[in-house]
């Protein structure tokens, strides 16, 4: 049995010009980067509308919109 801590790598992703360090398995790096890009795109759409201010509110609205797309 392998140790999960040793099976991960740290990946840097950028969302709204902010860098985040995220650990994931090597075979999940591509999906993580695509997910971060998708979240960044959705948050930018909300931010550019000007209707919602504050990074936390933009993030919550993006999360709700993304969840709605999959429900």
Regions found by a protein language model. Give the residues of each.
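A positional/architectural concept
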Residues: 1-27, 34
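Amphipathic, hydrophobic secondary-structure cores in small proteins
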Residues: 19-21, 27-34, 40-61
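Long, leucine- and charge-enriched amphipathic alpha-helices
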Residues: 63-71
């Amino acid at each position: 049995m392998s140790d999960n801590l040793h099976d991960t790598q740290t990946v840097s992703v950028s969302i709204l010009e902010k860098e985040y360090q995220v650990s994931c398995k090597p075979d999940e790096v591509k999906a993580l980067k695509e997910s971060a890009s998708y979240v960044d795109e959705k948050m930018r759409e909300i931010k550019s509308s000007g209707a919602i201010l504050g990074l936390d509110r933009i993030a919550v609205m993006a999360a709700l919109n993304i969840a709605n797309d999959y429900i």
